[in-house]
Amino acid sequence: MAPISHTRISLSMYNSWIRYFCRTGETNEAMSLLAEIHSLGSRPDPLSYVSFIETLASLRRTLEADALFHEVVRFMIYGSYSVRLYNALVSRYLRKEVSWRVVNEMKKRKFRLNSFVYGKIIRIYRDNGMWKKALGIVEEIREIGLPMDVEIYNSVIDTFGKYGELDEELQVLEKLQRSSDSRPNIRTWNSLIRWHCHHGAVDMALELFTMIFEDIGELVGKLKSQGVAPSANLFCTLANAYAQQGLCKQTVKVLKMMENEGIEPNLIMLNVLINAFGTAGKHMEALSIYHHIKETVWIHPDVVTYSTLMKAFTRAKKYEMVCSFYLVTL
């Protein structure tokens, strides 16, 4: 881009260029314009500050974002963007003490905390081992009459799941399903299934799977209508859960659903399928997946592939094949 001539540029033009550079990620150019505005004894407008802080925060340049934030607070440059300004800061800070400082500043200035901020607070508590305090936030939300949206429910579900409180996690799911304001979304199911698998409650994970996939066509249709498609991560988690139980048909079904969504099975997924067949005692089917991997140009067997095959053929007492796979790994 050609350099900007700064002679006789109006303040509104400065603001327009700052916002443009923020949108395009050219923060150094925006910083130069900010410095020039300051040298002229003026300041950007509220929207320019918000755009600047959002951009810096998204790039994890939190010290610079914090400095601009304090400038905004000091000179009361809020406009109509005060909540958006605070949300940008809260969403990007990784350290709980800094996030809390921003939240407390919001409370001090009588800004109404929204569900986004409360969800962030719950996650701060969760990530620092204070899950009971995280649940106390839910009571605060109820007391002020803020509707419990799906993001708050998801934060609570993820908190219970992380600390193995699976019964409580399911109770929150029931409340969400009964809610007139919110419904479970793909993040809800991802979290429920992932934590149940993580804590060894595979049967319940499979039950949750059937709850969302009773009518796969209807589910996918709903997700797409909301602009959300089932993720590769969800399919992988479900396939692995079935594979651990040796449920081959279900594992294959999940992989086919994934292919129907245009997600190509990768080596991890195919290793999962080998494991499913091996656990079910179908070593020849496991071998056919191995041959498929070998024939695929962009995928190559790894140590997991061979170790899984060795387990499958050990179960089948085909020890000569176990030796042959072992030799390949040397």
Curated annotation (Swiss-Prot):
Keywords carried by this UniProt record: Repeat
PROSITE patterns the UniProt entry points to: PPR
Disulfide bonds: none
Keyword Repeat among UniProt keywords: yes
Transmembrane segments: none
PPR repeat spans: 10-44, 45-75, 83-113, 114-148, 149-179, 185-215, 231-265, 266-296, 302-330
Protein family per UniProt: Belongs to the PPR family. P subfamily.
Protein name: Putative pentatricopeptide repeat-containing protein At5g36300
Native species: Arabidopsis thaliana
